[in-house]
């Protein structure tokens, strides 16, 4: 029974994420999510009583997966030899991958919805704090000082986030990747060695 319930939740969350990408938050209905997942609307309500509950759970699901994947990348042998390249790969997955549009839809909705704002803010803060900790350790394990690691993480994040916003209307992954390769080359010259930033 428990495994069936978990499988049903997974299907409903997956359908929610797909429909957020296709129709946006405003166009999302619990009825359509239930149909996409192969359930009745009543069955959906057994797991999620409101649209807000469903979307919050879908957001948490996405970021839990991002933490798992980020942890795997940060622990890989590649991250020990080139942590920046590994970190860029993780950032691409989060900000330039298929989950970015659904999570952006969630963020915009949560910004002004009092029922969604607090829980969404909580798991977003947990995600960022967890990933900062994981990647700080990965960079420092590869020989970066704490100051270097902080600056490299934050500056790379801001670059990729800007690309992510641009990608909402102008998709150009090859260009973004070429730009990130150049950024990586600049960082590796040591020209930014004395730069400082607070990890956030």
Task: Label every PLM stretch briefly.
Residues 13, 56, 85, 128-132, ...:
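An amphipathic alpha-helix signature
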Residues 8-11, 15-53, 57:
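Helix-turn-helix
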């Amino acid at each position: 029974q428990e495994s069936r319930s978990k499988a049903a939740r997974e299907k409903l969350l997956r359908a929610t994420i797909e429909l957020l990408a296709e129709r946006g938050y405003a166009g999302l209905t619990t009825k359509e999510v239930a149909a996409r997942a192969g359930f009745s609307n009543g069955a959906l309500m057994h797991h999620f009583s409101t649209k807000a509950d469903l979307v919050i759970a879908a957001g948490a699901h996405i970021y839990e997966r991002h933490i798992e994947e980020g942890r795997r990348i940060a622990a890989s042998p590649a991250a020990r030899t080139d942590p920046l390249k590994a970190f860029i790969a993780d950032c691409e997955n989060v900000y330039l991958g298929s989950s970015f549009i659904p999570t952006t839809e969630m963020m915009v909705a949560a910004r002004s919805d009092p029922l969604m704002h607090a829980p969404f803010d909580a798991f977003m803060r947990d995600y960022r704090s967890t990933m900062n900790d994981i990647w700080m350790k990965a960079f420092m394990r590869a020989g970066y000082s704490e100051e270097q690691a902080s600056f490299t993480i934050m500056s790379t994040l801001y670059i990729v986030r800007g690309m992510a916003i641009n990608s909402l209307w102008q998709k150009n992954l090859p260009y973004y990747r070429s730009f990130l390769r150049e950024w990586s080359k600049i960082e590796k010259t040591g020209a930014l060695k004395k730069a400082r930033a607070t990890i956030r």
